[in-house]
């Protein structure tokens, strides 16, 4: 694959990942009755599982770049997670802020591990 093709692929596939994040986050947020950022949590946990799965496969360098960096990188969002956690703290919702950190880290690690284990079964 040429460098130009990889760059174009990253741009296009990254666009798909970011649109999917917008759709999933919005759908979850509309159904959640609390100010807790559940949409971002669902996106990041599913992204961790997917990246773990992709990491467990024997992908070529280009395929890993397109699937992992472009799609999953655009789909997941560390910066939004941090901003939403900081806002919970500003609003004095300290338990929710701490829960967002702990749940994201613990379940994110577990999701990545499970994804990787599932890939080894394929």
UniProtKB/Swiss-Prot annotation:
InterPro entries: FluC. Na(+) is not transported, but it plays an essential structural role and its presence is essential for fluoride channel function. It is found in: Cell membrane. It is a multi-pass membrane protein. GO terms for molecular function: fluoride channel activity; metal ion binding. The chain crosses the membrane at residues 4-24, 38-58, 63-83, 96-116. Its main location: membrane. It catalyses: fluoride(in) = fluoride(out). Keywords: Cell membrane, Ion channel, Ion transport, Membrane, Metal-binding, Sodium, Transmembrane, Transmembrane helix, Transport. Na(+) binds at residues 73, 76. GO terms for biological process: cellular detoxification of fluoride. Coiled coil: none annotated. Pfam families: CRCB (PF02537). GO terms for cellular component: plasma membrane. Fluoride-specific ion channel. Important for reducing fluoride concentration in the cell, thus reducing its toxicity. Belongs to the fluoride channel Fluc/FEX (TC 1.A.43) family. This is Fluoride-specific ion channel FluC 2. It comes from Mycolicibacterium paratuberculosis (strain ATCC BAA-968 / K-10) (Mycobacterium paratuberculosis). The gene is fluC2.
């Amino acid at each position: 694959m040429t460098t130009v093709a990889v760059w174009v692929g990253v741009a296009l596939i990254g666009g798909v990942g970011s649109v999917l994040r917008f759709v999933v986050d919005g759908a979850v947020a509309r159904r959640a009755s609390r100010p807790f950022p559940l949409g971002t949590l669902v996106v990041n946990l599913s992204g961790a599982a997917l990246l773990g799965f992709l990491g467990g496969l024997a992908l070529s360098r280009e395929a890993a770049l397109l699937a992992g960096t472009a799609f999953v990188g655009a789909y997941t969002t560390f910066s939004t997670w941090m901003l939403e956690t900081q806002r919970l703290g500003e609003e004095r919702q300290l338990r929710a802020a701490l829960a967002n950190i702990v749940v994201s880290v613990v379940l994110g690690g577990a999701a990545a591990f499970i994804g990787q284990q599932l890939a080894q079964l394929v």
